[in-house]
A protein has these predicted regions:
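Active-site and adjacent substrate-binding regions of carbohydrate-active enzymes
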Residues: 1-317
Length: 317
């Protein structure tokens, strides 16, 4: 999850892209973390939210207040307020749009009213993010995990791929060996085409979650041969879009129930271990959600799925 300042516990509503949320420490702490990781041969990637900001971000607040100050019927002028073009404002109340109080304007916020969507048609916004990327690379970051890449333009894969192509090329021009992984939550037949962007990896959602291919195989719903065929089919499809792709298999994440709760009965612990082993043995760069190695449980509300790491045997107390 993101480490930047935010109004929420999950930090996906960023208020400042060039700082650390005080709950996690300081920039000095982060520098120490990166340095110590690098000494041990560990690379550091950070969660990067490009689909939306917080409604409390300076960009949005400036644009929102500018629209509130416009005379009725007047059109916004980006020369007067560049930030008004950083977001998607409309006089039509479309799906996922919310009112700008005191005006006849609406803004897009597909995930939540407090997370307004960014407008990736805007070149100045791209310049802003190029500077933000450089900021984190200067601190030694080795790559980025891009959140919700399928929603930059909801339902328009080609436009999403174009943004990712720009981002990949921009980052690699600054750090050739940077690692980029994207979250495009869908079936593999959809996110496979996103490899056209040149991005290194995309999370392999087809194998994840309580009803994914791994869990269904462990439960005996699918046989071993079907599991093997799924591996071959996905790898062949990804390879048809990119000859440099690195699969990003995972078993569960912060939006899913934890895997220790997928199974019941006398063999549940063994099944949990088997599922995680299958994930780690897939080709590519496997991701392990913190706490999975301990058998942490959590389901239902998002807060339960994102409980703090158990650092000691009495953590539950």
């Amino acid at each position: 999850m993101p480490i930047m300042p935010s109004t929420t516990y999950h930090k996906y509503d960023v208020t400042d892209y060039e700082a650390i949320d005080p709950a996690y420490g300081t920039m000095d702490d982060f520098t120490t973390l990166v340095d110590e990781c690098h000494k041990r041969g560990i690379n550091v990637i950070i969660d990067f939210v490009m689909n939306h900001t917080s409604s409390q971000h300076e960009w949005f607040q400036t644009a929102y207040q500018y629209l509130q100050g416009l005379p009725k019927g007047a059109e916004p002028d980006a020369l007067e307020c560049p930030y008004v073009d950083y977001y998607n404002f409309s006089k039509e109340k479309l799906g996922g749009y919310y009112p700008v109080e005191g005006t006849d304007w609406y803004y897009e916020g597909q995930f939540w009213s407090e997370m307004p969507d960014l407008n990736w048609d805007n070149e100045m916004l791209k310049t802003e993010f190029e500077q933000i990327v450089q900021f984190w690379l200067d601190f030694g970051v080795d790559g980025f995990r891009l959140d919700a890449v399928k929603e930059f333009y909801s339902g328009a894969d080609d436009k999403n791929i174009a943004v990712l192509t720009w981002f990949n090329d921009m980052v690699k021009s600054k750090k050739e060996d940077a690692y980029l992984v994207g979250e495009a939550w869908n079936d593999y037949s959809v996110y496979a085409k996103y490899y056209q962007s040149g991005m290194d990896s995309f999370f392999d959602f087809t194998f994840a979650d309580k009803d994914g291919i791994i869990a269904d195989t462990v439960k005996g719903i699918n046989g071993a041969s079907a599991y093997g065929k799924s591996l071959v089919n996905t790898q062949e499809l990804y390879g048809s879009y990119s000859d440099t792709y690195i699969d990003a298999p995972f078993y569960t994440n912060h939006d899913m129930a934890r895997s220790a709760g997928y199974y019941s009965g006398d063999y549940s612990e063994a099944q949990t271990k088997l599922g995680n082993a299958m994930n780690l043995l897939m080709s590519g760069s496997a991701f392990l959600y913190y706490g999975e190695e301990l058998g942490m449980k959590g389901s239902g509300k998002d807060e339960n799925k994102r409980a703090p790491m158990y650092w000691s045997t009495d953590a539950e107390d």
